[in-house]
């Protein structure tokens, strides 16, 4: 089966006043097209740092070491400029974070936040087309009353609904790869199962690949 992403010898270090701290050392894995890969480990083992590396989100004093290779559809990403990363993020690869309340902008309505990704990557769309695409994506995530939800702020929604909104924000541009960083940790067991089922359904419908990051083998 064709590989969408190949990670070879990924190493990430943080250079602090106390010297070099190795966060990730020599990890290698690949992600097949249309399939799910799970990164499983205890808290603090470097799972989220690995995910951020794949999105070009390692900030100083952190650094992806020169021997690392991140190959996406045959292209080496580690040498990307910030402009190239901005094009890659959202269009080719999106991320769902652990805590939607922290990740979503509390001052912006849900509809505007979903539409923002479309505006950044599909500038040829009209205002009405952006609204309709955002609404359709929200409908696909199973949010009740999607039209009403578009006009709400994140704090007005339950934890499960916020996570669905996060998935809609990530998926509205139909990326090839979705990175889900502990997407169900902050949710109760019933809602956890619903979110996992939703991700599986969208994967089947859109043909995307998923990297799921978790410490819970039950989720895997």
Question: What do these predicted ranges mean?
Answer:
Residues 69, 128-148:
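Conserved ABC ATPase "signature" region
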Residues 65-76:
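Conserved ABC transporter NBD signature motif
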Residues 193-207:
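Helical segment within the ABC ATPase nucleotide-binding domain
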């Amino acid at each position: 089966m064709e590989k969408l992403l190949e990670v070879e010898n990924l190493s990430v270090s943080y250079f602090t006043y106390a010297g070099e701290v190795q966060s990730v050392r020599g990890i290698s894995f690949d992600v097949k097209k249309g399939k799910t890969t799970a990164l499983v480990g205890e808290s603090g083992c470097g799972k989220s740092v690995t995910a951020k590396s794949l999105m070009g989100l390692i900030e100083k004093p952190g650094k992806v070491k020169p021997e690392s290779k991140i190959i996406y559809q045959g292209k080496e990403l580690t040498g990307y400029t910030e402009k190239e990363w901005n094009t890659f993020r959202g269009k080719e690869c999106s991320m769902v974070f652990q805590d939607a309340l922290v990740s979503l902008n509390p001052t912006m309505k849900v509809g505007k936040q979903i539409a923002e990704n479309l505006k950044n990557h599909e500038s040829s769309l009209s205002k009405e087309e952006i609204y309709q695409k955002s609404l359709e994506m929200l409908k696909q995530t199973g949010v009740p009353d999607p039209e009403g939800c578009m006009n709400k702020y994140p704090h007005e929604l339950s934890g499960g609904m916020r996570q669905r909104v996060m998935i809609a924000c990530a998926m509205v541009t139909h990326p090839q790869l979705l990175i889900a960083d502990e997407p169900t940790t902050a949710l109760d067991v019933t809602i956890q199962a619903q979110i996992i089922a939703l991700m599986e359904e969208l994967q089947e419908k859109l043909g995307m690949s998923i990297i799921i990051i978790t410490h819970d083998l039950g989720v895997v």
